[in-house]
Amino acid sequence: MIRSMRTAARAGCLQARAELRIAFLTPTFFGMLLGPCFLVFFANLERHKQIANTISGSAYALVGLLGSIGLLGAFQIMSEMFNERNDGSLLRTRTLPRGTESWMFGKLLSVSAVTGITLILGMAAGFFLFPDLQSASLADFLVLAASLVFSFVAFLPIGVALGSLVRSTWGFLISMMAIYMIFLGAGTLSPVSVFPKPLQWLTASTPIYWGAHAARSAV
């Protein structure tokens, strides 16, 4: 059993390496840069706000968005499962011994790497653009990195579950819109105090809110 698991992990690593080569060594890489650009763009929309009269709205929003980026990783997993189910790739992996496990392990590795690059680029851009982040120490950034890892791990099962449930294009589009609405609205861009009380309670019950809150607490 251990030998078969090791074989599945090795196959998953080969799959992840092939996918990452496509992601980083082809024009696809320029599309991947859109993620950090959008994060910085949405954060910059909040530049005229002050949070508690001490923190700029841009720094608050960017760190909150980065803390919730695990949800985008979950969306990536969902979209990969949807696309590869439709083109038959996922079905073919099921015919191989431990094919599903190796496929999932490879996807987790590749999505984690792409999400990590998005985080690094977004944080680097924010460090130079938003002065409030420049006062953070190395220890603060290490704590931030740890909170982001926990956020990513918390959201991945959601992506796998949605990928298993979504079977139609309409279902995929509805799930995508819901994910992006939650990503931008669950206390990531601005404090939930601007919402009505019932919506504040609903937002505070979501893991994305606590992911953003943990990231902001770190820095």
Task: Please identify what each model-predicted range represents.
Residues 100, 104-183:
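Alpha-helical transmembrane segments and their short interhelical loops
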